[in-house]
Design a protein with these regions (language model features):
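Radical SAM enzyme [4Fe-4S]-AdoMet core and its adjacent flexible, acidic
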Residues: 84-99, 103, 107-212, 217-219
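A generic structural signal for short coil/turn motifs at secondary-structure boundaries
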Residues: 21-24, 154-156
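Radical SAM/AdoMet-radical enzyme domain recognition
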Residues: 1-14, 23-148
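Short acidic donor-binding/metal-coordinating loop in glycosyltransferase active sites
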Residues: 17-18
């Protein structure tokens, strides 16, 4: 990444899925190595940890708060929605195990530098209920929810019939965010963070994907 980044100073590394905490020692070693060489090459590494939460410990929390510019915490929302897919080898849902860990990590970060990231499917096209659950019941304010990517014949795949419902959900979310803003209790929705005057598209059209020159994702 350093060799191919040219004059770019800020470099992003995302520890991503599978599940990075299955190999936490390698994450620590890679960060330590990057820190040892970044000044020599006039680079500034920023690390992100994306995790399903099962492997979070006090050590992980301390390390993330010291080394990670951002932490992405995977939670699909309501318990029944999350536990439909996020299960362990025994088939047990993860919700009850991970929510307290996520809350502890976010509190230790001062409520900053994190996102709750969920995925909505054909089974929960009412995904604002999942976002509002995370905000109102769990106390999270930095939220992201993305559509599933699945084969068209998958039971989880979104359909043409789902689209009007989804459009209504995004409208509902926008209005609710305005209400919260006026009440002095705002929430952030990642995909609504847009610069209406200077969008990102022109840069992507000129330079393409930044993978390998300014950004890299590392799996276990």
């Amino acid at each position: 990444l350093i060799e191919h980044s040219g004059t770019r100073r800020n470099l992003e590394v995302d520890f991503f899925g599978g599940e990075p905490l299955m190999n936490f020692e390698v994450c620590k070693q890679l960060v330590a190595y990057a820190r040892s060489i970044e000044k020599e090459h006039n680079k500034n590494f920023r690390f992100t940890m994306t995790t399903n939460g099962i492997g979070i410990t006090d050590e992980v929390i301390d390390w993330c708060n010291k080394e990670c510019h951002n932490v992405v915490l995977s939670l699909d929302g309501r318990k029944e929605v999350n536990d439909r897919f996020r299960v362990d080898l025994a088939g047990n849902g993860s919700y009850d195990r991970i929510v307290p860990k996520f809350q502890k990590l976010v509190k230790a970060r001062g409520g900053q530098g994190y996102y709750m990231r969920g995925t909505f499917t054909h089974h929960n096209v009412d995904f604002t209920k999942d976002l509002f659950h995370m905000a109102d019941d769990l106390g999270f304010t930095e939220l992201s929810m993305e559509p599933v990517v699945a084969p068209p014949d998958s039971p989880e795949a979104l359909t043409e019939e789902d689209l009007p419902k989804l459009f209504d959900q995004y409208e509902l979310l926008a209005n609710d965010m305005l209400r919260r803003q006026k009440a002095g209790k705002p929430i952030t929705f990642y995909h609504y963070i847009l610069d209406l005057k200077h969008g990102p598209c022109i840069y992507k059209r000129i330079s393409g994907c930044g993978s390998g020159t300014e950004y890299m994702a590392v799996t276990p």
